[in-house]
Structures are given as C-alpha cells and as structure tokens.
C-alpha cells in the first residue's frame, strides 16, 4: 500500500482500472481509500473497476499471520477481491480462491537460491508456478456456481436414489390411509416423499399390496 496522496490522485485520474494491495491497512482505511478513488471518478465521469488485494506486508508471511479469512470481510466492500501472497509455497494462494479471491499475485523467481535477497525464498520457481496455475484452475472448477442445484451427473441416478410412497403392509379396498400405512422405498418413480398430505385421510379405491405404490388415481 502506497499512502502518497498525490500519487493516488494521479492514478485515479488516469481513468484506468486500479488494483490495490492492502498491506498494513485495516478495513476502515480500505473503505476510505476506495471512497477517495470513487469520489474522483464520480467528479470526472469515470466508470472503471477497482480490485483490492488482501496482503500481509511480511516477507515471508508466516502461516499464522496470513489471515486468509480477511478476504471474506473485504468482499463486503462490493469490489473484486484478490490475494497478494507472500507465504512460502502455494497452498495459501490456492486456498484464497476458495475464500473468494479472483486475482492472485505471487512473486516469481528462476531459482529460489538465486541470491540472498528475501524475495527469492518466498517466490515460486517455474515448476511451482506451473503447479499454482493448475491448482488454482482446479480450485475454480471445484467451487462451481455456488447454487445448490442437481448436477448433470446426478440426474442420471435421481430416480433411482429418491423414494416413493408405498404401502407399509397389505391395505384393503376402502382403507382410510394413516401414517402407519405408509413406507418410503426406492426408486422415486411414484408419488415422491414429502407429499404425504396428498394421501393421508384418503380412502383407497382398490387393494394395495405391501411395497406397492400408492397413487393418486387409487384414492377416493
């Protein structure tokens, strides 16, 4: 995070998308920074995107200080949230995707032992960076849409795993159905479980054997 006010003003007035890293900032400071930029944009008819990067300004960042859950808090600001990763390895970056990060920044080096400069130790070499890309892509696939819907593969087995309302025992014609008369078995090709109110208290038109479907057509 660069707190040079004139620089922030100049950057905001370029009218370009802005990505901001938030090291050594708390939530109140982040809000003020976003408001500062949006105010300039509003006064200059600029419409652009802001992305904020959760960041811990520590090299390397210790696992117990990575504070990845802060990504969720930053999402309350209704802008794109990313993660600037200074931990050793790629686990934190991959986990950040599951928490909502949509941009990943990771330092890159040809060799972790290239020099004594701290960045080389916490950076990813070509092999690890390739692994990071693949794991982030896979994490995105695993997250899915976020909507609890029946998946395509589930539709193939849906009828087989759902249950239907059947007779718990042999039921004679004119039996008035009660809870004790009902059972629920697979497949779900009959009246689905959860529709018991449609049959309870109704009279059977004809006999139903144990395990047979109870259908609306057979009710008076």
Regions found by a protein language model. Name each.
Residues 1-220:
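Catalytic cores and adjacent flexible loops of soluble metabolic enzymes
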């Amino acid at each position: 995070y660069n707190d040079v006010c004139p620089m922030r003003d100049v950057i905001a007035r370029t009218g370009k998308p802005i990505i901001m890293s938030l090291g050594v900032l708390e939530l109140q400071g982040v809000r003020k920074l976003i408001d500062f930029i949006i105010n300039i944009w509003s006064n200059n008819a600029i419409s652009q995107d802001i992305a904020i990067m959760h960041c811990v300004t520590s090299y390397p960042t210790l696992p117990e200080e990575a504070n990845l859950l802060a990504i969720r808090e930053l999402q309350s600001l209704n802008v794109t949230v990313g993660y600037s990763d200074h931990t050793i390895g790629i686990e934190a970056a991959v986990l950040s995707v599951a928490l909502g990060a949509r941009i990943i920044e990771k330092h890159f080096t040809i060799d972790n032992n290239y020099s004594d400069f701290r960045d080389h130790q916490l950076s990813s070499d070509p092999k690890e960076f390739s692994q990071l890309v693949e794991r982030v892509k896979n994490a995105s696939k695993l997250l899915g849409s976020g909507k609890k819907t029946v998946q395509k593969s589930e539709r193939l087995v849906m009828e087989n795993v759902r249950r239907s309302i059947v007779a718990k025992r042999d039921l004679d014609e004119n039996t008035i159905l009660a809870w004790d008369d009902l059972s629920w078995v697979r497949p779900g090709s009959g009246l689905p479980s959860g529709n018991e109110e449609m049959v309870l208290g109704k009279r059977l038109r004809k006999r139903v054997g144990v395990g047979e479907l109870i259908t609306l057509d057979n009710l008076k």
